[in-house]
Amino acid sequence: MTVRDLRNVNTARMRIRSLHRWPLLAVFLLLSVVPSIATDPASVTFSLDFPNSSPEHYSIVVQSDGHAHYESSGKVSADSDVRDAYQTDFTLSDATRARIFGLAAQAHYFSGKVDSGNKKLAFTGAKKLVYKDGQRNSSADYNYSQQPAVQQLTTLFQSLAATMEFGRRMTYFHHYQKLALDDELKRMEDQAKRGDLAELQAVSPVLKEIYDDTSVINVVRARARRIMEMQPLPAGK
């Protein structure tokens, strides 16, 4: 066998070895991708658009791992001309997270007819529910729904939004208008006692900032602490 023949044999062996490596590489890449796909959390999103209301728009995205994202836009308050875009992340309690996904399942993940279709009803905002997971991506637009599960979800998300909007206003007032905190916290405490708010712990950071701020009057600081310690009534039932 000549030197040239030996070189050809060695080249052929190297090519065969290279070909053997490709299936292993493909398997490795597949295994590295599959876990990330499998662990992507499911999500439920609620959004509401209501011109000339406060806020005019908001959306809440809740993931099956409990992570949640809220964003809104509109006036800081009904009697203010200041407009603000706001967004924040927070963690839901296990009970509320489980309730949201349980109600989404009862509503067939919003895949069927959700809106009542009654055109005589007053417009209360353009609402949308979206469900996403590895197998589904379904949504429904509605003004009013007769489905009990959708009604409960709507009330729960609106209670969540009310809590987050208190957080938005308190953040603004604490920085720019501290005298407005007294009335704002009074309203928040009253609504929490009535069960109109959900997940008060989501705004605990700003409540703590107010309580820790010695430049804020004591009655306001005391009310902020009381709200932090409250166990609100279940919302959305």
Predicted regions mapped to residue ranges:
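Bacterial N-terminal signal peptides that target proteins for export
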Residues: 3-24
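Bacterial N-terminal signal peptides
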Residues: 23-33
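Short, well-ordered, aromatic-rich surface patches in folded extracellular/luminal domains
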Residues: 37-52, 113-237
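Extracytoplasmic
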Residues: 41-43, 55-57, 63-65, 95, ...
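N-terminal targeting signals for Sec/Tat export/insertion, comprising classic cleavable signal peptides
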Residues: 48-72
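A short, structured loop/turn motif at beta-sheet edges
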Residues: 65, 91-99, 131-137
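A short, surface-exposed interaction/processing loop segment used at functional sites
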Residues: 68-82, 158-169
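A short-motif feature that recognizes glycine-rich, charge-decorated loops
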Residues: 72-112
